[in-house]
Amino acid sequence: MSSNGDTIAADVLPLGGPRFITAARAHQPWFGHRYEVAAYWIFAAYAVAVVLLATGQDVIWAAWAAPAYCLAAMALPWSRSWGVAVLTAVFAVLAPLLVLMAQGGEWAAGMTVIERSAALLIKDGTPYLPSGQLSSWLAYNPYLPAMAVFGLPAAIGLQGAPGDPRVWLVLVTVAGLAAALSLGVPHSVRTCPGCRRTLLRSIAIATACPAVALNLAVTTTDPPVLALMLLALALLNSPERIWPAAIALGVACAMKPTAWLTIPILVAMLRYRDGGRAAVKFCAGSVAVFLAITLPVLLANPIAMAQNTVLFPLGLTAHLTPAQSLTPGDLLARTGPAGHDLSVGLLLVTGMVIAVLLLRRPPRSPRAAAWWLAIGLALMFTLGPDERFGYFVYPLGLVGWLALTRPAKDDADTGGTPLESTPVAA
């Protein structure tokens, strides 16, 4: 029996050995009603700020999301938590997404790139236009080859919603979040109604939070990458799931370079927790999946891939992206070549510091690794020469996942922040 009177399911402790996830968690995580109400008010404040300060499609999202968050915060004390969360997700994601899909226009330029890349992949074996056809910034494809999969339905002739990349981006994101969060429930969701409600609530909150909801509504390509990263972290709560975690992370790395930092951090964690063999297995699996997806495209036209995925994001091509941000690194890069070099130098120094700290004080659990990753990515996106505020969906999403999956009673073995990592003797 658990502390709240619930019987622990028989499969909580498999014959192969104890789980790393605490078996006797209560159904309700620590993130209870009081914290949830506060979170919705914070979400509402963010959405109101977007209405006042942003422009374009972001304002359309905020016009739907702000009242949804306010109503959720007011209704939560008298309503079922999971029902409020689901309705909030519908009005914060689905409603503005449908409005923007019906509106169309230039805001969907990223989807045009994905659709074109899928058609090129089928026709030429590469999703990238050759240098002679790169006539404007929109001709470039900064995504890695796996991102083209979201354009394949349109490339094979599907019309309407089934062929729209935006629909598939949302579906993959929600599926990835659901899979990651389902691994943290204490019992089987098929037999435990309490776990089903908790899981549904967590999925809805994760989808409705502004970091994810805004990016889903305006359809950026980051949420599915984040979802796969979270899935890899959740899978590694069990040492028996190294291969599935490696596959999930390898696919994420083949979509965008924003997932690359996850590999060394998780390798350091596995080396400390499970030994060198497990770390090598995970690293080899992730890299093998990444190479299996990207290497054929690289061999088909290496120059085109380098121009699109390396030179264009670094601002080293004739046509520059019109997107801008006010991050310190981007502001430095705009001052000229010296500022650009300084930004790159700061980024390299940050990377070296992270590498040294990983060797000296490796994270001891997936939760600690998630803190490492959130802090590392936040520093990279702050100091990088060509970063966007939208990239902060990664550190914010990681912190949100940590909040939603934190057990009601922390076990000392579940890890913590990077400061709680265990030092390794020199």
In which residue ranges do the predicted regions lie?
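Hydrophobic/aromatic side chains embedded in well-ordered alpha-helices
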Residues: 203, 216, 244, 250-251
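Membrane-interface junctions at the ends of membrane-embedded or membrane-associated helices
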Residues: 236-245, 269-278, 403-426
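Composition- and surface-driven signal marking solvent-exposed, interaction-prone regions
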Residues: 393-396, 411
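The feature captures the transmembrane alpha-helix scaffold of multi-pass secondary transporters
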Residues: 228, 243-247, 263, 375
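Hydrophobic alpha-helical elements and their junctions with loops/disorder across both membrane
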Residues: 124-125, 239, 253
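Transmembrane helices and adjacent periplasmic/lumenal helix-loop junctions
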Residues: 247-271, 292, 385-391
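Primarily membrane-embedded glycan-assembly and transfer machineries that use lipid-linked glycans
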Residues: 2-233, 270-392, 402-405
